[in-house]
């Protein structure tokens, strides 16, 4: 790593890592803030890693990265069967710890992608080879900001060609750091380990290209389940809360429809313009009432709005 936070070289090795401690985000955040926690003995390493993470993020933003930050929501279930009660909590903030992990993950995956290209190893790359307006680079946190930049971004695709990922601000990106959670990461790690151990990758480019359609179909199906699962519990939460007013923000509009974001619950509802006042505009805060809520049908409707 050079002074301007560019990876000078990457040399992966196969070996065993000895875990010194099992630390959570909250403990690391407490230590970085100067408090006592199980992570305190490793404070110097955490500080060095955080400094690297901050420098790496700044470099990515300079190269056009679009970074979206929103709080994580924990869905709590109490009871069983028809007696389940749903509640939502916002996870404790740990921005330094999350930044440390996410940036080192991006750095590693980008470095491995470049190493693989240099050594002729085909990996599965996450690409977004599009031009993003310069004004969209940066860190976005409010519902209106997030809606604006997401609308302008083309979705990333999985392919075997090492092309740029504009949203990440990386020349190439091959996800490899989470082989236990993501199938593309497992394939990429297998390719890397096979080359290091056997002198050749496990699969050829042609074999991975043949695998991609089936893999993408399975990933899309799994993604639908992962998106629907928390959405189902949130819809059940709305239904259990009964008739009440919910804080919301308008994020988009056209002649026929208005899109509303519920920031705390991280849900979006779209309704006809007739439900809104004449002065409706993106960024406007208001309160909404929900009408019919169908958790199993993955649907809910806006019933009424009022300005605040």
Identify the role of each PLM range:
Residues 1-308:
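Electropositive polyanion-binding surfaces
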């Amino acid at each position: 790593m050079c002074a301007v936070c560019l990876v000078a070289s990457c040399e992966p090795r196969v070996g065993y890592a000895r875990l010194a401690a099992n630390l959570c985000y909250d403990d690391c955040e407490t230590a970085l803030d100067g408090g006592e926690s199980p992570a305190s003995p490793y404070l110097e390493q955490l500080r060095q890693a955080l400094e690297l993470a901050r420098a790496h993020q700044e470099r990515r933003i300079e190269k056009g990265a679009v970074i979206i930050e929103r709080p994580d929501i924990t869905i709590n279930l109490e009871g069983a069967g028809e007696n389940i009660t749903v509640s939502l909590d916002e996870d404790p903030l740990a921005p330094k710890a999350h930044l440390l992990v996410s940036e080192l993950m991006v750095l590693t995956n980008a470095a491995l992608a470049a190493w693989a290209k240099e050594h002729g190893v085909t990996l599965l790359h996450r690409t977004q080879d599009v031009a993003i307006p310069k004004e969209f680079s940066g860190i976005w946190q409010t519902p209106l900001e997030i809606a604006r930049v997401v609308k302008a971004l083309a979705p990333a695709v999985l392919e075997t060609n090492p092309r740029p990922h504009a949203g990440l601000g990386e020349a190439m990106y091959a996800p490899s750091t989470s082989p236990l959670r993501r199938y593309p990461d497992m394939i990429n790690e297998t390719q890397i380990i096979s080359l290091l151990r056997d002198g050749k990758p496990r699969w050829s480019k042609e074999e991975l290209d043949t695998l991609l359609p089936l893999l993408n179909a399975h990933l899309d199906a799994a993604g639908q389940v992962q998106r629907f699962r928390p959405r189902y519990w949130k819809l059940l939460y709305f239904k259990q809360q009964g008739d009440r007013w919910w804080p919301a923000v308008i994020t988009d509009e056209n002649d026929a429809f208005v899109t509303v974001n519920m920031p705390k619950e991280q849900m979006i509802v779209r309704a006809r313009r007739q439900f809104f006042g004449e002065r409706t505009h993106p960024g406007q805060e208001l309160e909404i009432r929900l009408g019919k809520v169908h958790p199993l049908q993955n649907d809910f409707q806006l019933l009424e709005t009022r300005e605040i």
